[in-house]
From Swiss-Prot:
Its cofactor is Mg(2+). It comes from the Eukaryota. This is Squalene synthase. SUPFAM superfamilies: Terpenoid synthases (SSF48576). The gene is ERG9. The keyword Lipid metabolism applies. GO terms for biological process: ergosterol biosynthetic process; farnesyl diphosphate metabolic process; isoprenoid biosynthetic process. It comes from Cyberlindnera jadinii.
Length: 443
């Protein structure tokens, strides 16, 4: 009933769901009939651990589909060891630090997780993942192994860091480093894979700040959103350098009398996350294969929509919040072109700016940050260019023009999907009206 009410209140999202389910094209669908039993099982494990990631991964170009599936499962297995508090550190730390070495084997498994650990299956059946890992091209294996080594050691370092375990993250520098180990390293690996497949401009792997920002923007958004959940679990990821300006203890924001200070703290955290947006837009402009672009773009547009949701939202301090399913579908459909992504970012940035209030200590900083991003977006897609004037040639504008070759076919597909959706909904509307009219006449 709740979902039906949401659709009734947001009819545009109903159209998006119809378009997504019935008319969206997928030219890279898997064909399980041609796959080995081991490969099929790996995709089953992928769906068991994350249905949302599985859906996007399964639509990737065949060159990278299995590569990124294996990469995700390897890192999920690593994470499943790290988060399981039932595993003694004497066991956990060596496994984390040596996990990359297990990739050289073909039959290693691990059954030391708690029976209640929901993702333990990826470790119990890790030999199947290893089988598919060894089917990959050597250059892809090398990337996966390198990132696994860095992430495993990073996880172990944080477990052994008594200051972090006692006090959480203290400085913004600590915050950035933690987010890099959790998400920036993933961005590093994915970027290397995309460039190796020749699906992205080589600048992606040269300018490391771009892929770092991709990961940090996502992770910081999740950390802001998950405040209440982390507090309940006894975890602290908001940096004290920020929250210490507004409270004596991080948990104070859960008290009703501290709501205003909590919202101001969220405001500063949002400002900090928005500092990565220009890098994110530059990164997306350099991805030159459609399915890889979709894979990179979808999480980023979800992140900016989530930042708008958490901004000035007191519910973040007392409960878990998330964007509506219909909104998610709309964002997936709109983000299939670079111009669509730019439009989404502009829309949500303006919503954030509109919700900001002069009483917020971060009001001026927020306005300046959003203004810089809007100026960058104008450089990508100038709103108004007087007749006879040629837009200024910049590196981002040059890349945008180059990407038009990729975006134009997708724009045509999107227009076709929208037309079919409207025809279907109009036909259904006419049919329903006819039935109602007939019933009324009989009565």
């Amino acid at each position: 009933m709740g979902k039906l009410l949401q659709l009734a209140l947001h009819p545009d999202e109903l159209a998006s769901i119809v378009q997504f389910k019935l008319f969206r094209k997928n030219e890279n669908a898997r064909n399980p009939a041609t796959e080995s039993a081991e490969l099929i099982r790996c995709y089953e494990l992928l769906n068991l651990t994350s249905r949302s990631f599985a859906a996007v991964i399964e639509e990737l170009h065949p060159e990278l589909r299995n590569v990124i599936m294996v990469f995700y499962l390897v890192l999920r297995a690593l994470d499943t060891v790290e988060v399981d508090m039932s595993i003694e550190n004497s066991v956990k730390l060596p496994v984390l630090r040596q996990f990359h070495e297990k990739l050289d084997t073909k039959d290693w498994t691990f059954d030391g997780n708690s029976p209640n650990e929901k993702d333990r299956c990826v470790l119990v059946e890790f030999d199947r993942i290893l089988g598919q890992y060894h089917e990959l091209k050597p250059q892809y294996q090398k990337v996966i192994k390198e990132i696994t080594e860095k992430m495993g050691n990073g996880m172990a370092d944080y477990i052994e860091n008594e200051n972090f375990n006692s006090n959480g993250l203290l400085t913004i520098e600590d915050y950035d480093l933690y987010c890099y180990y959790v998400a920036g390293l993933v961005g590093d690996g994915l970027t290397q894979l995309i460039v190796l497949a020749k699906f992205g401009n080589s600048e992606l792997s040269v300018n490391k700040q771009l892929f770092k920002s991709m990961g940090l923007f996502l992770q910081k958004t999740n950390i802001i959103r998950d405040y209440e959940e982390d507090q309940v679990d006894g975890r602290a990821f908001w940096p004290k350098e920020i929250w210490g300006k507004y409270a004596n203890e991080l948990s104070d924001f859960m008290k009703p009398e501290n709501q205003s200070q909590g919202l101001w703290c969220i405001s500063e955290l949002v400002c900090n996350a928005l500092d990565h947006v220009i890098d994110v837009l530059q990164y997306l402009a350099l991805v030159e294969e459609q399915t890889s672009f979709n894979f990179c773009a979808i999480p980023q547009v979800m992140a900016i929509a989530t930042l708008e949701l958490v901004f000035q939202n007191p519910q973040v301090l007392t409960q878990h919040v998330k964007i509506r399913k219909g909104t998610t579908v709309s964002l997936i459909l709109e983000s299939r072109t670079l111009e669509g992504c730019a439009r989404i970012f502009r829309r949500y940035l303006r919503k954030i700016h509109h919700k900001s209030h002069p009483s917020d200590p971060n009001y001026l900083r927020l306005g300046i940050t959003i203004g810089k991003i809007e100026q960058f977006l104008d450089g990508m897609y100038p709103h108004y260019v007087p007749k006879g004037i040629t837009p200024q040639t910049t590196s981002i504008r040059t890349q945008v023009v180059k990407r038009l070759q990729l975006d134009e076919p997708m724009k045509r597909d999107i227009d076709e999907e929208i037309l079919k959706t409207r025809i279907l909904l109009l036909s259904l509307g006419v049919a329903v009206f006819g039935v109602v009219y007939g019933v009324v006449r009989i009565i």
